Amino acid sequence: MSNLPEAKLDVLLAHHASLEAQLLGEVAANDYVRITRELSELNPLVEAVKAYREVRDELGDIDDLLEDPATDPEMRAMAEAERDALDAHREDLIQQIRVALLPKDAMDERNVMLEIRAGTGGDEASLFAGDLFRMYEKFAALQGWSVEVISASEGTVGGFKEIIAEVKGRGAFAKLKFESGVHRVQRVPDTETQGRIHTSAATVAVLPEVEEVDVDIKPDDLKIDTMRAQGAGGQHVNKTESAIRITHLPTGIVVMMQDSRSQHKNRASAMNILRSRIYDAEQQRIDSARSAERKQKVGSGDRSERIRTYNFPQGRVTDHRINLTLYKLPQVIAGEALGELIDALTTEHQVAQLAAQGHAA
């Protein structure tokens, strides 16, 4: 038995047909975009359901043939071989349908606020933070996404002490959300004369870009300070108070922004980041309260959790959450093979979700 929710699948097929019918009539521009987007999301599931039902019917015909005592031995052998192949195909389709029916993260389609901070390791940590940012930047380009740097504090020898960027593209959060955590690098610094391997770290935070309707921020909960922007050495770099610091009093979250000469633009950027951080903090609190659910996740999303090691001497990348090692570090750092890690993490997360629903992977 497949244990698929046939009634629910019937409703989805009917809804898909209704959307296709709407496109044949006169549709407003906004509705056209909405309908085509929804169809593109439903198409893989609908195709899998139709294929599954065709295979199910074919298997029924084969069973009838095998139960018929008049079926000759040669025909029976052919039917049994075809049944085995169709059985395997049916199981694949059932798994596809179950995965497609898993509850979606409401934020999966959102843009991303990507924050990378150098951790332990001094200058090497800053250089590694720069490597990570370029890795995500190249990966984003391969996905057809855009990356806009919101704020950056450069390291003394290169890289970044901290960099915040907005990654814009459909499904950005779904792809990048498992990247949050501590990334560790092991390599020989250029300044190391004895050839010793140094270990450094950088912290990555991937936050969904949230809108005002997603987070209720009361004006009375904000403390807003303005000041003159400062350069690397602490000197004031302009005469107007364009820098802004916003403190969310209930949570203690502070965002400082001074990259633009416009106070208005700095304030808007700071509020965007603040909303994402408040939303993320609330999600962290909810996840912590749901200990049973948290165990089924690929990592907890805890910013202090070491999730991945990049070992340059061995040319390997190891993701500790799923014990996956790829000996293609240059391709991962170039953004080209990062998708292999992300896909493996996504699959593991889906397997855990299916197991929680009582389905074997």
Curated annotation (Swiss-Prot):
Region (Disordered) residue spans: 286-305
PROSITE patterns linked = RF_PROK_I
In its record, the post-translational modification comment is: Methylated by PrmC. Methylation increases the termination efficiency of RF1.
| Record-linked SMART domains | PCRF
Q: Would you say which domain of life the source belongs to?
A: Bacteria
List UniProt keywords, sorted A-Z. Answer: Cytoplasm, Methylation, Protein biosynthesis
- Per the annotation, which location comes first and is thus the protein's main one? cytoplasm
Task: List locations, semicolon-separated.
Answer: Cytoplasm
Residues found modified as N5-methylglutamine: Q235
Purpose: Peptide chain release factor 1 directs the termination of translation in response to the peptide chain termination codons UAG and UAA.
Task: Provide the family line.
Answer: Belongs to the prokaryotic/mitochondrial release factor family.
The name this protein carries in UniProt is: Peptide chain release factor 1
Q: Which organism is it from?
A: Rhodopseudomonas palustris (strain HaA2)
Q: What is the phylogenetic placement of the source species in the record?
A: Bacteria, Pseudomonadati, Pseudomonadota, Alphaproteobacteria, Hyphomicrobiales
Q: What is this protein's gene name? A: prfA
